[in-house]
Amino acid sequence: FASSRCYFYKKMILYLYVNALCEHFSTGSLFYQMRRHIMNNYRMGTKCVQAGYKPGNGEPRQIPIIQSTTFKYDTSEDMGKLFDLEAEGYFYSRLQNPTCDHVAAKLASMEGGTAAMLTSSGQAANFMALFNICECGDHIVASSSIYGGTFNLISVTMAKMGITATFVSPDATEEELNAAFKPNTKVMFGETIANPALTVLDIELFAKVAHEHGVPLVVDNTFPTPVNCRPIEWGADIVTHSTTKYMDGHGAAVGGACLLYTSPSPRDA
């Protein structure tokens, strides 16, 4: 994506998002097709069933599970273009896999986002969202009522990397939020409904303050899921999920997701 305030997602992370966002790819590309089938104008039930994947003639009716670590190409030149980020395509499933991309597109549709990525866990999604915005010397403003693992991630793990944080109440006033900002603040973070306190974040106010300071708002939407709340509609720029919880629903799979909204981001700031 193009933005005068290009805060985040560089190198490979940027490339993966750009694959799904850039208009210059051919209309026959997988990424273009995924974007076409985000289906923002459809109801939630239809998105849950159909978004992110549309089979062609003779192709699998359901999203196929691609169980391969790597992908074959006919020439080393083809592979070289992939490694140099000059061409789109798959080459290593740790970075990108068709199954994951289709599921990510479905989640982007459900949230009303532009694109999404799957991660190995919800904490991985939060770390990816925050660490690709911040670097050593930067500052985060975060809600104090968040999942304990995320609180530890921000207050302990990221502190070891030179990234500091100020925690504020999820129902803080506009004046209190503004007071938490520093010249080096790069992002705001909160949870729609906190785990486990169940406090509710004032997303609209957090987004307003974040954008006035020219930074994006990241919201963890794990508890409500997009069926019940879509933070992007209230001003969030990035949405994360621990799909381990309600999205999986069976306690059988650990996973996460990171979703991006850009029009541009953050919100014409």
Residues of each region from the PLM?
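N-terminal "arm"/small-domain region of PLP-dependent enzymes with the aminotransferase-like
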Residues: 39-97, 105
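Single conserved hydrophobic/aromatic residue that forms the stacking wall/gate
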Residues: 261-269
